[in-house]
Structure formats: C-alpha cells, structure tokens
A protein has these predicted regions:
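Major-groove DNA-recognition helix of helix-turn-helix-type DNA-binding domains
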Residues: 15-42
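Basic Lys/Arg-rich amphipathic helical interaction modules
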Residues: 1-24, 46-82
Length: 82
C-alpha cells in the first residue's frame, strides 16, 4: 500500500523538479501541504499531489487551446541541422 503522505523530496522526485521548486509550490499554496512534528516538516497528501497534477494537465490543455501554435513557434522548436 502506498503511503498516505509524501515528503517534499518525494514530491520533487515525482514531478521531476528541484526541492526548492517543490517548497515554493507549497509556500505559495498551489500544492496543499501540512507541517508535522516538532521541527515542522512538510508533508503532502498523495491525493493532493494527484489533484495538483490533474489541475496542471487541465491548465496546460486550456493554455494550448487558447494559444495555438504558429509557424514561427514550430520553426523555433526545430533544430538547425544545416
């Protein structure tokens, strides 16, 4: 059975981002978390992380819909093999 709560390091690994980026997500309120223990270590509930990921997929899909890819974007993304 998967753990209910994840450390910030676990979250960082899952999202493939740095520990400081994970901390910023928590401190900004974008990723709900709780402080536990006498030293106030952060924990993120696994269901909250899954909800965050789903929100990011939805926000990205909305962004892609409202910002269609133009030819200049495609040209900029293609490597110069010449």
């Amino acid at each position: 059975m998967a753990p209910r709560f994840l450390t910030l390091a676990d979250v960082a690994e899952t999202l493939n981002i740095s520990a400081s980026q994970t901390y910023a997500l928590v401190r900004s309120g974008d990723l709900p978390a709780i402080k536990v223990g006498g030293r106030g270590q952060w924990r993120v509930e696994a269901t909250e992380l899954e909800s965050y990921i789903a929100r990011m997929y939805a926000e990205t899909a909305d962004f892609v819909r409202t910002h269609p890819l133009g030819r200049d974007d495609v040209d900029a993304a293609e490597p110069d093999l010449g």
